[in-house]
């Protein structure tokens, strides 16, 4: 493998054995591709905005005299970029402008004669844009639209599995689900009649639908039944015989023909009898006349002479009726063929219960069911029925729905109309009847072939269409009002309903979620999440076990591990690593094609439906050099089952061992040794890890860390290769390689880094460069690390030296004992940034004012404010400190005569205002790192706002000037090269000022042209610079668009540094979580023979019952990795020769059986080997991919190489006594995470505070500064102890005895420690409630 200069800095040793056939795809493509499809112009008009416009336009007036046509649309440029939107709290969006054409036709002239055409571009609201990382910025916060897994449109056949009816009879049903429109259900009842429901309303006999479609009884029977023809010969009756129809019946008479008895009376007819009849070619037999009684006529029989109806279709034959038919000259009688086995008489029975007998009565019946209480007219009934399933405006199966519909009915074509046809309805009924008859299977609803993914683009398109349809109605009415000659398209369209629909979707839809931004992994996982909830999906309460369960079709598509614990389990899933959606929205996963027993590198993506037909081998099947299967029998999957197949039968093979799991689960090393429940917790807890101060790459990883860090977008990644020309904490400049430059550009890429920004979860986002000046970089290299990344690898926690042993009960019940060294070295110190906002509004009594002049506040409290009343940057503040001084005018109060006198003497008018300053919340302390002031247009800016503005302008100018200088330098370097090659002497050139170089003339025409081109570029650069500077200045100085009634907003950013402390929650990656019980002095921790103390002591009893053995293997492998690091460190300290170092490191990389990774250090320069060694001295990072990881033997070899006992256990000594522990202890390195459940956020204590209004009891909860509830069970405890006074105190003065608690406060102030309980307020509430029932209760005073 070829490594770039940056990748050579630290190479992770990979224990994977299987070759990597397919690279990990871009992990955010599901979001980005979907949205791209939505906004890009689609000439076919199948997707996105184009499809929405085409489905609604043209809008014709009711009279047909005019129409509004759609021509095209374009998206403008967003006003603010993403960062500005986040700071200002606005939506990152672009204006949508649509070109519309108003066509007016001549009234009296022939159809289609155009009178006037007007074309105009119309503004149709703002469309939120997706950022490069797959998120949306809505009102300044980053949000993610989660993809939805919903039931695909189409037809589904299902049964109630015998749960509906008490008899346990299985009732079958069919449901036609459109993409939009009414649902159509067919279902059997326990009496085997077929019923229909529209939109889940009351059921009607299914034949009503057929009658409404215009079918008569005769035609209905003709559609669903085979016929038996009887001929009357004198007094004999002959029947046409189809032998196959007799199977399973019992002969009720001798079946004979040509004098030979084939089946005797009372015998069961078997397949042998049928073969005999077929062989002899028997087509007719004579039957006794009684046999026909009870059979059903298939058509109407009329007496030709009188025209009288003798026998109607679907009428049961009796001997009398037979005689009548015979007399009226009907010699051939057709009856329906039915039997109890596989040709039920369901439709015939249904016709009997059908109240309607012609089309009109059927339509009326449907109208009554859909619109109860409205009087039906013929037109209304016809229109309603027509609109239900046969109107393109109201009903759409969609391409997916039609494809699934046709596939289900085994039709050949997969395309067709979006509305239903007669044939569609009849074929669904036929198939349902076949299933009831025992032919065919019901569908599996949880099969991923029946559930599809709806991503951002599609959902946004649907919302947009909803908005357009609202506008359509208004436009139709506008077109019909006349005076069109003066109107333009602009006057027709009101953009409000459209932008409201879009805004509602992005702002408050159940699937538009506040992005989980704890760390890069949680961002990526959130964007790859798939939810079965949401509009048009399931609800938590109704979802049963089947929907939540893992289904065989999830393999390689949806992760079986990563799902939340709790009520949403199984409803919210994560996309597997390699999964993607196909054009219809079904999930597909890649497989390698197997041809002639050889596994090729040809990759096919198969959906769940296609996969069912193939035999697929697992990724860890043994292959030889050529890719042939070594074993005769191979474990494969086929039709959802796993079993052994011969190697000749295999058609596909998995692409990778990681294919099954999601990104989160693929980051757990030795996942294959963990119990699934613990793996689930492990995958979920990685998402809650807080980024530490210094990220530390995991010693034991899985090789997925780099992909996650790069794709998450938190790192700065090189767009093009080149050389690092400049680097500081906030900017990296790359001079691009000549071969990657675009013609006519300066060839400089500038990367501005994000510094100390707040994330959605209040963690800190900051980027740090990881390249140095002059280094070569290639496209895709990581230039700067973001939060939780280390040299371009995901680093969620820290590598800690752990020992599994009990320690004085401090690790009881999963508690964790931590060494003080961890705190001293700031290993788990995290930075949290809070945003506090102060809003100044215009009130009825006058505007609120932000000022440092606050009534009744001492000097000390104002010491951290400037003259505008806003806190300084860098001030250290604690709970209760004022951050922004604000006063609110309060109404004139009635003054007492004394106050009036005082006012008159001291002339004090200041108390007309009350203090409403922004203060630091209780229990929070930190440093102010930034202040932003937003002022409404037209409101005078205060001094601080102007200072901030000036600072921003300076910064912007500095940035742009530096950018210009960098670009100029690049350009002049090229001009210099052209002039020198054109014959100008270099030293003379250097004496001239650079600007004069452009005036020089060259004799060589080519060179002169190049020089002129470069001169043009230089002018363009300067012009561009002026333009950018002006735009920036305008943006910074313009007023802000604030909500109505808001004059000013001051946002203060507070950074809090949190060290690890008892009560914080920590976890490993295997679901092994615990709470810190004690931070122990270093000298008391157990230490080894070299005197190295351990960092963390874990409870060994947490392992066996939980069956997450992965943590033990990780510990051993971590120890080995550290051992090798220490050996390298020792060699570096002794200044060993590079050859020795190279040889040792090479040996380490080569260790293992048949590993796929080949690192050849002989191609590395000495300097590169030294730098690699520097980066490996703290431990050699190791990758052990999921299901393809390091074997026990390899771990032992690595331990041996690191000079550690192969048991992985060492002797420890007690730090307090220095005595040896009795047995050896497992010690190693485990990757530990600090989770975002910090004790600082949970700790809470109340002295006095607010009370509830009605009950007068203290409020509850930390947010309200509430008290602890002393509940029913706690009262029982005090009663059981007989602690009467304590109980009285709890129920009165400490709770809701208002007078008692005020008296008690007075007593305490007076130093008199006594209490007199009074009447609890809740008792008064009870009295009032009883009185409200009309029962008077009076308390007797003693």
Curated annotation (Swiss-Prot):
This enzyme's EC code(s): 2.7.7.6
Database matches in InterPro entries: DNA-dir_RNA_pol_bsu_ext_1_sf, DNA-dir_RNA_pol_bsu_external_1, DNA-dir_RNA_pol_su2, DNA-dir_RNAP_su2_dom, DNA-dir_RNAP_su2_hyb_sf, RNA_pol_bsu_bac, RNA_pol_bsu_CS, RNA_pol_bsu_protrusion
UniProt KW keywords: DNA-directed RNA polymerase, Nucleotidyltransferase, Transcription, Transferase
The protein's name: DNA-directed RNA polymerase subunit beta
GO molecular function terms listed in the Swiss-Prot or TrEMBL record: DNA binding; DNA-directed RNA polymerase activity; ribonucleoside binding
Catalytic activity: RNA(n) + a ribonucleoside 5'-triphosphate = RNA(n+1) + diphosphate
Function according to Swiss-Prot or TrEMBL: DNA-dependent RNA polymerase catalyzes the transcription of DNA into RNA using the four ribonucleoside triphosphates as substrates.
Biological process according to GO: DNA-templated transcription
Quaternary structure, from the entry: The RNAP catalytic core consists of 2 alpha, 1 beta, 1 beta' and 1 omega subunit. When a sigma factor is associated with the core the holoenzyme is formed, which can initiate transcription.
Record family assignment: Belongs to the RNA polymerase beta chain family.
Pfam families: RNA_pol_Rpb2_1 (PF04563), RNA_pol_Rpb2_2 (PF04561), RNA_pol_Rpb2_3 (PF04565), RNA_pol_Rpb2_45 (PF10385), RNA_pol_Rpb2_6 (PF00562), RNA_pol_Rpb2_7 (PF04560)
Gene that specifies this protein: rpoB
Gene Ontology cellular component terms for the protein in this record: DNA-directed RNA polymerase complex
Coiled-coil ranges (or none): none
Organism: Pectobacterium carotovorum subsp. carotovorum (strain PC1)
């Amino acid at each position: 493998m070829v490594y770039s200069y940056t990748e050579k800095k630290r190479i992770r040793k990979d224990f994977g054995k299987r070759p990597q056939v397919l690279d990990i795809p871009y992990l955010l493509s599901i979001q980005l591709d979907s949205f791209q499809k939505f906004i890009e112009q689609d000439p076919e008009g199948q997707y996105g905005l184009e499809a929405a416009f085409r489905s609604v336009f043209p809008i014709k007036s009711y009279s047909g005299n005019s129409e509004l046509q759609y021509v095209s649309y374009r998206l403008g440029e967003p006003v603010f970029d993403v960062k500005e939107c986040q700071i200002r709290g606005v939506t990152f969006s672009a204006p949508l402008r649509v070109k519309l054409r108003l066509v007016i036709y001549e009234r009296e002239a022939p159809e289609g004669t155009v009178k006037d055409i007007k074309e105009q571009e119309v503004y149709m609201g703002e469309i939120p844009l997706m950022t490069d990382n797959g998120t949306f910025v809505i009102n300044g916060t980053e949000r993610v639209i989660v993809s939805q897994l919903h039931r695909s449109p189409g037809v589904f056949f299902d049964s109630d599995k015998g749960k509906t009816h008490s008899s346990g009879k299985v009732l079958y049903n069919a449901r036609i689900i459109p993409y939009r429109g009414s649902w159509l259900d067919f279902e059997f009842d326990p009496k085997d009649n077929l019923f229909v429901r529209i939109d889940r309303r009351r059921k009607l006999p299914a034949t009503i639908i057929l009658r409404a479609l215009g079918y008569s009884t005769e035609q209905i029977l003709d559609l669903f039944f085979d016929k038996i023809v009887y001929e009357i010969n004198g007094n004999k009756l002959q029947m046409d015989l189809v032998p196959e129809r007799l199977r399973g019946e019992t002969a009720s008479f001798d079946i004979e023909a040509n004098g030979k008895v084939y089946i005797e009376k009372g015998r069961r007819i078997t397949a042998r009898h049928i073969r005999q009849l077929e062989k002899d070619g028997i087509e007719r037999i004579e039957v006794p006349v009684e046999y026909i009684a009870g059979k059903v006529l298939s058509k109407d029989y009329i007496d030709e002479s009188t025209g009288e109806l003798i026998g109607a279709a679907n009428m049961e034959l009796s001997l009398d009726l037979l005689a009548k038919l015979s007399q009226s000259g009907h010699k051939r009688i057709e009856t329906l063929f039915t039997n109890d086995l596989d040709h039920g008489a369901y439709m015939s029975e249904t016709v009997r219960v059908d109240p309607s007998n012609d089309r009109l009565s059927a339509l009326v019946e449907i109208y009554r069911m859909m619109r109860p209480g409205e009087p039906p007219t013929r037109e209304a009934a016809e229109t309603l029925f027509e609109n239900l399933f046969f109107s393109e405006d109201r009903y759409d199966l969609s391409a997916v729905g039609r494809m699934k519909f046709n596939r289900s009915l085994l039709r050949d074509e997969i395309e067709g109309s979006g509305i239903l046809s007669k044939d569609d309805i009849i074929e669904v009924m036929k198939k349902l009847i076949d299933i009831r008859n025992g032919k065919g299977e019901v569908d599996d609803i949880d099969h991923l072939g029946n559930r599809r993914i709806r991503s951002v683009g599609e959902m946004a398109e649907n919302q947009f269409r909803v908005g357009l349809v609202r506008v359509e109605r208004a436009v139709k009415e506008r077109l019909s009002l006349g005076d069109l000659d003066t109107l333009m398209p602009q006057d027709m369209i009101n953009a409000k309903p459209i932008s409201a629909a879009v805004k509602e979707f992005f702002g408050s839809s159940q699937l538009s979620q506040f992005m989980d931004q704890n760390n890069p992994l949680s961002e990526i996982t959130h964007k790859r999440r798939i939810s079965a909830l949401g509009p048009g999906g399931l609800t938590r309460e109704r979802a049963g076990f089947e929907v939540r369960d893992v289904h065989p079709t999830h393999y390689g598509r949806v992760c079986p591990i990563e799902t939340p614990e709790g009520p949403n389990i199984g409803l919210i899933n994560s996309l597997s690593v390699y999964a993607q959606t196909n054009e219809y929205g079904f999930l597909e996963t890649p497989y390698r094609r197997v041809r002639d027993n050889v596994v090729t590198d040809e990759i096919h993506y198969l959906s769940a439906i296609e996969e069912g037909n193939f035999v697929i081998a697992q990724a860890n099947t043994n292959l030889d050099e050529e890719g042939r299967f070594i074993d005769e029998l191979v474990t494969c999957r086929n039709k959802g089952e796993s079993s052994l197949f011969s190697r000749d039968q295999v058609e596909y093979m998995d692409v990778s061992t990681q294919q099954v799991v999601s990104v989160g689960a693929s980051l757990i090393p030795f996942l294959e040794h963990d119990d699934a429940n613990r793996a689930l917790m492990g995958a979920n807890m990685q998402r809650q890890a807080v980024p530490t101060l210094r990220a530390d790459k995991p010693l034991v990883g899985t090789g997925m860390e780099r992909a996650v860090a790069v794709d998450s977008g938190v790192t700065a990644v090189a767009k093009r290769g080149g050389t690092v020309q400049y680097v500081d904490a906030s900017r990296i400049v790359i001079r691009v390689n000549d071969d990657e430059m675009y013609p006519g550009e300066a060839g400089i890429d500038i990367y501005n880094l994000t510094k100390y920004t707040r994330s959605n979860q209040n963690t800190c986002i900051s980027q740090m460069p990881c390249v140095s000046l002059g280094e070569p970089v290639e496209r895709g290299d990581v230039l700067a690390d973001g939060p939780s990344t280390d040299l371009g690898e995901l680093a969620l926690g820290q590598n800690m030296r752990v020992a599994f042993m009990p320690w004085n009960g401090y690790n009881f019940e999963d508690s964790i004992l931590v060494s003080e060294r961890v705190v001293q070295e700031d290993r788990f110190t995290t930075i949290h940034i809070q945003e506090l906002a102060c809003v100044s509004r215009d009130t009825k009594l006058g505007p609120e004012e932000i000022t440092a002049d606050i009534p009744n506040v001492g000097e000390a409290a104002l010491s951290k404010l400037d003259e505008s009343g806003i806190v300084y940057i860098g001030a250290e503040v604690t709970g209760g400190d004022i951050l922004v001084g604000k006063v609110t005018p309060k109404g004139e109060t009635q003054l007492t005569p004394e106050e009036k006198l005082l006012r008159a003497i001291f002339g004090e008018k200041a108390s007309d205002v009350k203090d409403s300053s922004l203060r630091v919340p209780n229990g929070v302390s930190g440093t102010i790192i930034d202040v932003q002031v937003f002022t409404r247009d037209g409101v005078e800016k205060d001094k601080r706002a102007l200072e901030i503005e000036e600072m921003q302008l300076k910064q912007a100018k500095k940035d742009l000037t530096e950018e210009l200088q960098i670009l100029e330098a690049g350009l002049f370097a090229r001009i210099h090269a052209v002039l020198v090659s054109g014959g100008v002497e270099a030293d003379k050139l250097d004496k001239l000022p650079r600007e004069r170089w452009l005036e020089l003339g060259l004799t060589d025409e080519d060179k002169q042209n190049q020089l002129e081109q470069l001169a043009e570029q230089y002018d363009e650069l300067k012009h561009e610079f002026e333009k950018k500077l002006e735009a920036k200045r305008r943006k910074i100085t313009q007023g802000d668009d604030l909500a109505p009634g808001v004059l000013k907003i001051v946002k203060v950013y507070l950074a809090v540094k949190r060290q690890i402390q008892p009560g914080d929650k920590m976890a490993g990656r295997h679901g092994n979580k615990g709470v810190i019980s004690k931070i122990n002095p270093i000298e008391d921790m157990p230490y080894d023979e070299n005197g190295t103390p351990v960092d963390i002591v874990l409870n060994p009893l947490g392992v066996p019952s939980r069956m997450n053995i992965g943590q033990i293997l990780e510990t051993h492998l971590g120890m080995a990795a550290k051992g090798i690091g220490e050996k390298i460190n020792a060699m570096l300290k002794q200044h060993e020769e590079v050859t020795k170092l190279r040889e040792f490191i090479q040996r380490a990389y080569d260790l293992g059986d048949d590993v796929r990774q080949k690192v050849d250090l002989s191609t590395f320069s000495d300097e590169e080997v030294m730098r690699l060694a520097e980066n490996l001295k703290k431990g050699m990072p190791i990758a052990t991919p999921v299901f393809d990881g390091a074997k026990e033997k390899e771990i032992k070899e690595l331990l041996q190489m690191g000079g550690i006992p192969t048991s992985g256990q060492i002797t420890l000594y007690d730090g307090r006594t220095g005595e040896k522990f009795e047995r050896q202890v497992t010690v190693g390195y485990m990757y530990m995470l600090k989770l975002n459940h910090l004790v600082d956020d949970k700790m809470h204590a109340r002295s006095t505070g607010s009370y509830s209004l009605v009950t007068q009891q203290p409020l509850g909860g930390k947010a309200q500064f509430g008290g602890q509830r002393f509940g029913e069970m706690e009262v029982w405890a005090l009663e059981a102890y007989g602690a009467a006074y304590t109980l009285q105190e709890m129920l009165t003065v400490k709770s809701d005895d208002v007078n008692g608690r005020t008296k008690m406060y007075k007593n305490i102030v007076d130093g008199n420690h006594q209490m007199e309980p009074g009447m609890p307020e809740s008792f008064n509430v009870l009295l009032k409630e009883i009185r409200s029932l009309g029962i008077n209760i009076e308390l007797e005073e003693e």
